[in-house]
Amino acid sequence: MMRVKKTSRKRAASHPSRIPKVELHQHVDGSIPVALAWKLMKRHRLNPVETVIQMEKLLVLQDQERGSLLRYLDKFHYPLWITQFYENIARVVEAIVEEAYQNQVRLLELRYSPVIHTYAGLTLRQTISAALSGINRAKKRFPVQAGLIVIAMRQHGPHIAKILARSAVAEGQQFHERTGVIGFDVAGLERGNSPKLFKEAYSIARIGGLGLTIHAGEDEGPHAIWQAIDDLGVTRIGHGCSSVGDKVLLRRLARDKILVECCITSNYQTGAVKPDRPHPIFTFLEYGIPVAICTDNTTVSGTNQTLENRRLVHKLTVPQLTMIHQNARNYSFIRTD
């Protein structure tokens, strides 16, 4: 259990940038650097506006758009125009890894939904291969551990999720000398798409040796997290904000050492956490629940790992932040053997 206490903002604020960081929850499509997105838009003559400044407003959540997960997810619309081509996918992934490394990220798990990158003719396996290629290019340039988590979108249904799970297993890290797929996730709007619907897909992923995580408790109640734990057997929860309303669930997360991937900036932007409420990460720490400090989408949220850590220094010391990152490394799906 980590005791949360106040510390001097002035003393701590200059140091989080130096912490070696672990990023366990970052989406490819929501993290493409604006300058690169604009360059690729122009190259393919797809730019919907005339200037990069106008483009930035379409890619980055604006103040008046805060408070809605739907408005937040709408920011993924334009990046999909350029990530339908193999080389573009590899290029944006390489750039994302580079940007993370510049923010002292030394272990990075990117996540990505292959289905929504097949509209121009790429197969599922080709879209996965393109993302892995981008990671491998970056790893040649920077000393960083990195891997790919495959996402199934809830709105595509359980059958597509099973197909994706099989494709992810086929590209698993155990079959690659370099980078492979390390995990499986389900994301998208939760309501009407309960975790138990995807039980077969998670069974395929588990048998195939993939790590298991899921987006749960972001726009749905604690029952979604209970299902994810009991029916799917996940070892990590993405967001998990609604669990603070269920003390029994909090104790279960602590007992089973299930890590919560906390995305502070994103959770306030989507309305998962109300503006006047403290972020659940502090409750998780008080209960002894493992956590990871995550960006979710660096471009959409206008954030990075350094900024996320700086948001926490009013209650956590730099040694505590360092310990969180060190412990998060133990929950990574990347194999080191």
Residue ranges: model-predicted function:
Residues 3-210, 219-227, 231-236, 242-259, ...:
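Metal-cofactor-binding active-site regions of metalloenzymes
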